[in-house]
Amino acid sequence: MPAIQNEIAQLTAELNQHNYRYYVDDSPSIPDAEYDRLLNRLKALETEHPEFCRPDSPTQRVGGEALAKFEQIKHLKPMLSLDNVFDEQEFTAFNQRIVDKTGKDLSYCCEPKLDGLAVSIVYRDGVFERAATRGDGQTGEDITENVRTIKSIPLTLRGDNFPPLVEVRGEVIMPHKAFDALNERARVKGDKLFVNPRNAAAGSLRQLDSKITASRALGFYAYALGVVEPETWELADSHYGQLEQLRSWGVPVSQEVRGCETVAEVMAYYYDIQQRRSSLEFEIDGVVVKVNQIAHQLSLGFVAKAPRWATAFKFPAQEEMTLLEGVDFQVGRTGAVTPVARLKPVFVGGVTVSNATLHNADEIARLGVKVGDTIIIRRAGDVIPQIVAVVAEKRPDDAKDIVFPAHCPVCDSEVERVEGEAVTRCTGGLFCEAQRKEAIKHFASRKALDIDGMGDKVVEQLIDKELVESPADLFRLTASAMTMLERMGMKSATKLVAAIEVAKQTTFARFLYALGIREVGEATAANLAAYFKTLEALKAASAEEFIKVDDVGTIVAAHLAHFLAQPHNLEVIDKLVEAGIHWPAVEEVAEEDLSLKGQTWVLTGTLTQLNRNDAKAKLQALGAKVAGSVSKNTDCLVAGAAAGSKLTKAQELGVKVIDEEALIAILS
C-alpha cells in the first residue's frame, strides 16, 4: 500500500474512533484543536489524492452513528454541520467566495457557537411532538422524553401564527451554574466528574431515565428553522427575522444574536463576544456567521456536508494536549505546599503554557495523574491554566506517581496536613525563607502598606542578602545598606527609604490586612478594624468575640485566635508599632451614617477622579460590601471609563448603574 494511501487509512480509522468517543460515548479523548488538525490533514491528503478517499472517511458524513439503545428517527431533511474558519484571513476568504458567487456584498447574521448538542424538535399544530439528536445528519436518536424535561423548551407554541408543522433546530446546553452544581453533587458522592459542560449536556440528554435528565437543569437555544409545512407558509425573508419569529412563538433564542452589515461589523462582534466569553452563562467555542437573506442562502446552496452560506468562526483553542514532564513543590505565604506541574510548552488560549498548578493531593488523586502522562490543559480567557484530564491510553510504562514531600522543599521543616483541610503546609513559619519572602511581599503590596518601589525582586534580594527577616526589619533599612542590591543606586535607595517612611502612616484596616493572617482579606480586615477600633482590644479578644464580627465565621475566628496566640507574631506586631507605624483613631460610626448597609456594590472601568481603593474604602465605611463580580444580588454598579463585561452583565440583570460623578455625590 502506498505511503499516502496508508496515512489516509490510518487517519480515517483514528478520526472515526475519536468521533465515536465524542458523539456516542460522550467521552472525547483529545481536545477539539487536535481533532481539527488531524481532520485538516486528512482533507488535504484527500484533495491531493481523491482516488484514496475511503467511503467511511469522516469528511464524507456528519457526526457519529445513532445509539442502538434509542429508537432512530430519520430527519425530515438532513441536519448538516458547518465548515470552520480559524482567523480573520480565513473569514475574509469565506466572505470573498460569497461575493464572487453573488456579485455583491451581503449582510450577515451572527450568533454564538454554542458548545452543546444539536437537536431537532418538531411541533405539529403548535404542540411539541418529538425531538431527535443530529446523529449522522440523516438519522438521529429519539430523545423526545428527555427533551420534554427541559424547562426552557415550550410544550406548546405561543400565539396562532405558526405553521401546522414546524421543525426547530437548536443546541441543548448546560449553563455554567448547572454544570458546577452537577459536579459538586458528584464530588460529594465520590462519582466521576464531567470534564466540561458539553460532555455533561450530551450525557444528560442520553439518559434512559428521563428523571435524571430533568434533574440536570439543561438549557436550549434555537439557531434555525428546519422543515416547515406547508412550504408556502409565509416566513420572514431573513435568517434574523426567522429567529425573531421563533422567539415570538416562545422558543428560546440567544440574546447575543446580531445582524451585521459589513465584514468589519462581523469582526467587531467576534472580538467583542470573545472578550466576554468567560462572563457568558454558557460555553461557546466561536461565532456562527450566516448570510442573512434567505433568498441568497438558497442561491448559494450546499456542498456535500455543509452550507456555502454559513461558517463557524472558531476561537483559538482553549484545550490542548501536552506532556507532564515533572512536578515542583512551591511554598506560599501561609506555608501551603503547592504541586506545580512542569509541562512541555504548549500554545493554548493565546499564550504559551509551561506550568500549571495541581492544587493539592486531592486534586492529583481525582485526576489520577502521573509524571510522564499526556494531559489535557485548558486555559479560558484570563483564567489560570489548569489540567482537566489525563489521556490514559497514552500513559507510558515508566510513568511515576506524584508523591508529596515529607519535609518542606525550602527549609526542610516537617510538613503537615490538618484533618479536614485539602492543603499540605510547611510548619516552619517565618523560619522558612519562602514564607518570609511571600509574607513581606504581601506586607508591602499595594492593598496593604503600599510601599512604593518595594517590588517582588527587591524583597527577594533583601531576604537573600539577609537584610530583612520580618516585616518589622523593613523600617530599619538604610539607603546605604540597600545599595547592596542589584540595580539599586543611592538615588533609588534614598527614594525607597522615603517610601517606607511614608508607609508608616496607614489605617488600622490596612495594617491588619498586611499582617497576612489566614483568610483575613481586605473586607474582613475592615470589619475587624471597625468592630475592635484599637489594636489592644483586638489582641485581647477571644475566638468567641471574633465570631461577633460581620463575615467572620468559626474558621476565620480560629485562624485569628491562633495567629494572636503565637509569641513571635505578637513580637512582630510590637516591633512594627515601635518602628513608628500608626493610624488615625477608628471613629464610631452612627447607624444613620451606614446608609449603604446591607448593599452589595461593584466597581468597574477606570475612575478618573477617585482612587479605586479609596472609593472602595469609602463605600465600606458607609456599610456597603464591595464585590468583584456582578450577580443578581448586586445592588449597584459604578461604571467608570471603558467599562466592559461587568457593565453588560449588570444591564442584562437590570442592576442599577451609576457613573463616577454620581458616586462622588453619594460619598460626599
Swiss-Prot record:
GO terms for biological process: DNA repair; DNA replication. NAD(+) binds at residues 32-36, 81-82, 111, 134, 171, 290, 314. InterPro entries: BRCT_dom, BRCT_dom_sf, DisA/LigA_HHH, DNA_ligase, DNA_ligase_AS, DNA_ligase_CS, DNAligase_adenylation, DNAligase_N. Gene3D superfamilies: 5' to 3' exonuclease, C-terminal subdomain, 6.20.10.30, BRCT domain, DNA ligase/mRNA capping enzyme, Helix hairpin bin, Nucleic acid-binding proteins. Its cofactor is Mg(2+); Mn(2+). PROSITE patterns: BRCT, DNA_LIGASE_N1, DNA_LIGASE_N2. It comes from Shewanella pealeana (strain ATCC 700345 / ANG-SQ1). It is an enzyme of class 6 (ligase). One of its GO terms (molecular function) is metal ion binding. One of its GO terms (cellular component) is cytosol. Residues 591-668 form the BRCT domain. The gene is ligA. It catalyses: NAD(+) + (deoxyribonucleotide)n-3'-hydroxyl + 5'-phospho-(deoxyribonucleotide)m = (deoxyribonucleotide)n+m + AMP + beta-nicotinamide D-nucleotide. DNA ligase that catalyzes the formation of phosphodiester linkages between 5'-phosphoryl and 3'-hydroxyl groups in double-stranded DNA using NAD as a coenzyme and as the energy source for the reaction. It is essential for DNA replication and repair of damaged DNA. HAMAP family: DNA_ligase_A. The lineage of its organism: Bacteria, Pseudomonadati, Pseudomonadota, Gammaproteobacteria, Alteromonadales. The active site is at residue 113. Pfam families: BRCT, DNA_ligase_aden, DNA_ligase_OB, DNA_ligase_ZBD, HHH_2, HHH_5, Nlig-Ia. Its EC number is 6.5.1.2. Zn(2+) binds at residues 408, 411, 426, 432. This is DNA ligase. Keywords: DNA damage, DNA repair, DNA replication, Ligase, Magnesium, Manganese, Metal-binding, NAD, Zinc. Belongs to the NAD-dependent DNA ligase family. LigA subfamily.
